[in-house]
Design a protein with these regions (language model features):
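Compact, glycine-rich, soluble single-domain proteins
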Residues: 46-60
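Short beta-strand scaffold segments in enzyme catalytic cores
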Residues: 27-36
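Short amphipathic alpha-helical face segments that pack within enzyme cores
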Residues: 57, 61, 92-95
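Alpha-helix C-terminal capping segments
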Residues: 35, 65-71
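Short acidic-glycine loop/turn motifs at beta-strand connectors
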Residues: 36-38, 113-114
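Short, well-ordered amphipathic alpha-helical segments that serve as non-catalytic structural scaffolds
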Residues: 13, 58-66
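C-terminal binding/interaction regions
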Residues: 1-23, 71-152
């Protein structure tokens, strides 16, 4: 867990990022701030598009920005939705974040709680996730306890 000061600072960075959001269609600004494993903070905002499926979520913009700067491990991400505090990453963003788990296997998601920052492990938002380890098991011929129903 992040200490209270670090969680509040990360959430403040996410709120600042939300101010840069391009949301002319929904008016729903979202900001995200990533804390990388080396302590760097990287932000992103949502970028809407008239072709709605091409909209980029703040979390994925922040991940892309972090990757472009050479960061690969994410310690925490704060998400700010000023119009409706307490918003969480969508399913697609949860899956993308899961791709960049640090060695300890935990990414903290910092949300705007009613009494201050609320820290939630990504695993609780994405139970039974699919990630790189699943592909490694498949490549190595391990089932990982899952049965292929087509072979029964």
């Amino acid at each position: 867990m992040l200490d209270e000061t670090a969680a509040m600072a990360l959430l403040a960075a996410a709120r600042d990022a939300a101010r840069a959001a391009y949301a002319p269609y929904s008016g729903f600004a979202v900001g995200a701030a990533i804390l990388t494993a080396d302590g760097t903070t990287v932000t992103g905002c949502n970028i809407e598009n008239a072709s709605y499926p091409l909209t980029m979520c703040a979390e994925r913009v922040a991940v892309g920005t972090a990757l472009a700067a050479g960061h690969r491990a994410i310690q925490a991400i704060a998400v700010a939705t000023p119009a409706a505090p307490g918003g969480t990453p969508c399913g697609a963003c949860r899956q993308v974040l899961n791709e960049f788990l640090p060695r300890d296997g935990t990414i903290l998601v910092v949300l705007e709680g009613s009494r201050g920052p609320e820290q939630v492990p990504l695993a609780s938002l994405l139970p039974r996730s699919f990630g790189p380890a699943d592909l490694n098991r498949a490549r190595d011929g391990e089932s990982g306890g899952r049965q292929d129903s087509s072979r029964q």
